[in-house]
Regions:
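Acidic, metal/ion-coordinating pockets
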Residues: 4-315
Length: 317
């Protein structure tokens, strides 16, 4: 009888243990699934913007000759840096603000083909045009586009009746996780800066009007973040249209990634637009010495929250 009681008690204890273990296991599994889902949801609300400007055909790093920039830049180190960021961050956009061409013998000899191929290899998502991108002539730029897997965005140049007709776009919309991003491009006035025979019948249009019109289209299409790739230059003493004026005189642009003036910003500049909203402007010098990085987290605020920004020095090891 005692033996039967002992066996029965052991059986009951085993059932309790199995039941409790199953419950605990289910709770642990549910907790793990919830944590995984929460992590995935958080990742879908985060976006990393990487950007360059005025690389000027600098495919190789500066030589180790004792100069200030020795060992800096070069597509190999930039590609490795971009790849490492993509491995740690799911949603990344890689952008360029113009003056891809001119500045080294590579352009003199190959007219931009290796530059476009290098950017394609690195997975650039979009770029705009700078004045030096016309240095080989508008026909040459149109020819080199066959080597680019990314779009050239520019909304204030009318390329009708030129070799670039229907080969650029005013904007493009990207979907990264739950975030919808609209990107537009702006170019500087070419007259007086570029010989007319190099840009042909290209018509320059007011960048403020063009930017407001294009950004309004992007806003109406539900974009959570609107980025302008600008080759206007950051600011001028003579009142010439610049990124500073653009930021203040537009309504829906959130971030301006600039070029032309070769400024190394330590942190993005902040301006207030016509709707009293914050606009960030950033620029990372020239020659591919730095890679700009701006991180957004849209899970914190519906309008988006910048959580970090930095310029990363590209140095060869």
């Amino acid at each position: 009888m005692q033996k039967l009681k002992t066996e029965l008690l052991m059986s009951i204890n085993r059932r309790k243990f199995i039941k409790h273990t199953a419950v605990a296991g289910s709770a642990l599994l549910a907790s793990t699934l919830i944590n995984d889902e929460a992590h995935a949801a958080a990742a879908n609300n985060k976006l990393t913007i990487l950007h360059t400007n005025d690389v000027h055909s600098r495919l190789e790093p500066f030589p180790m000759d004792g100069s200030r920039n020795q060992g800096m830049g070069g597509v190999a180190a930039r590609a490795a840096l971009v790849e490492s960021i993509r491995k740690e961050t799911e949603h990344v956009l890689l952008l360029d603000a113009g003056d891809i061409f001119q500045g080294t013998p590579y352009f003199n000899m190959y007219k931009g083909e290796p530059e476009m191929k290098a950017m394609t290899m690195m997975g650039y998502d979009a770029a705009t045009m700078g004045n030096h991108d016309f240095d080989g002539g508008i026909e040459n730029f149109a020819t080199q586009l066959q080597h680019a897997s990314f779009p050239i965005l520019i909304c204030n140049y009318d390329f009708s009746n030129t070799p670039l007709e229907n080969k650029t776009a005013p904007y493009k919309i990207f979907q990264k996780g739950k975030i919808k991003i609209g990107i537009l491009g702006l170019g500087i006035e070419l007259e007086g800066l570029v010989p007319q025979n190099l840009y042909g019948k290209t018509i320059y249009q007011d960048p403020i009007l063009a930017a407001n019109k294009t950004a309004d289209i992007l806003k109406k299409q539900g974009c959570d973040l609107i980025i302008c790739l600008s080759h206007l230059g950051d600011k001028y003493d003579d009142g010439k249209i610049s990124d500073e004026i653009l930021a203040k005189e537009t309504e829906n642009i959130d971030l301006i990634l600039g070029g032309h003036t070769h400024r190394f910003f330590e942190i993005p500049r902040k301006y207030t637009n016509k709707k009293q909203n914050e606009v960030l402007v950033n620029q990372v010098g020239w020659a591919g010495i730095q890679l700009g990085r701006i991180d957004y987290d849209f899970s914190l605020y519906s309008a988006g929250k910048r959580v970090a920004s930095k310029s990363i020095l590209i140095r060869n090891k």
